[in-house]
Amino acid sequence: IDTYPGTLQVRNHIVRDIRNYGQIDLGGLLMKSSNVGATRIALQLTNDHLYDVFHRFGFGEVSGCGFPGESPGVLPAARGWGTLEKATLSYGYGLSSTPLQLAQAYAALANGGRLRAPTFVAGTQTPDAAVLDPQIAATVLEMLEKVISEGTGKKAAVPNYRVAGKTGTSRKAVPGGYQSRYISVFAGMVPVSHPRLAAAVVINDPRGK
């Protein structure tokens, strides 16, 4: 994936990386959180294909946990997407999700590509469905492990455990756009060899380094 020179103009908007990463593969895209790389991939997909990826992993609908008042988040209809909407969706803008939805999606990767409805009752079996080929899920899991060992998620490493996950930062949404305040997110699973836990952590207005 060519991310040179670290920026990409989409209509009247400039997509930026923190620096020029040049040629990277999918693993490198995840390790470096390349917005340019994610945009280039998204623009090669149809609206329906990209929407299907989000929807299969549970975004835009309630998780199935049965918790009263659960938010489905926001996933706009694909028919309204232009190139700019596809670009921003590829790196996490233009939609919203709950921490539970994020954890559920990462649990699906850890579960061999099967999305299972979460439950608050230990030992309860809930419905699940195949959303991704098991081999592809395993490959993505390996990439996410490198995010922890070599990329932006090094602080999530746990001694003697193989951790996989992804960091993220987004500006807070306000009516008509975004403000200059941020939300930081980490989602992941452990241990990679035999995943038992998946979690999503959200930090509102992070401070410090």
Protein language model features and the residues they cover:
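Beta-lactam-recognizing serine transpeptidase/beta-lactamase-like catalytic domain environment
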Residues: 1-207
